């Protein structure tokens, strides 16, 4: 990170890391990469900077997660002042630094195919719509976000026609690979 940006984080009340790459390193930090990329929180920690980081992962992050997190922070700051308001926002983060209002629910437990999973009925192909796609590589059981409810711009979400690849998780992409398997 350039020195100017690093200095800005010293005086910032908090930093929002938007997208999985900014939050955890994402694809640039994947195995085999020579970039030495890392998430914002890891980079600040390495530099000894204690500014709180709020991670808004996703590839891409859902726009409501970004706007909602900013609105939540502004509301808490207005109600309680800067320090107490930000402390409350930080208390609403999960262990990975994500806001629980958006990342507190498991994708698998809210999947429209959960009943098929429970019945043991799995799809053999991506075009087969009558079964759970877990056997095809769906990462929903280990993924947390509310995309099942919010969708992208209220229109659609990954599992509607494909599988969850776990893009909101710190282990993405290496820990979520291979994306497709049988």
List where the protein language model places each region.
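Long, low-complexity C-terminal extensions of enzymes
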Residues: 138-182
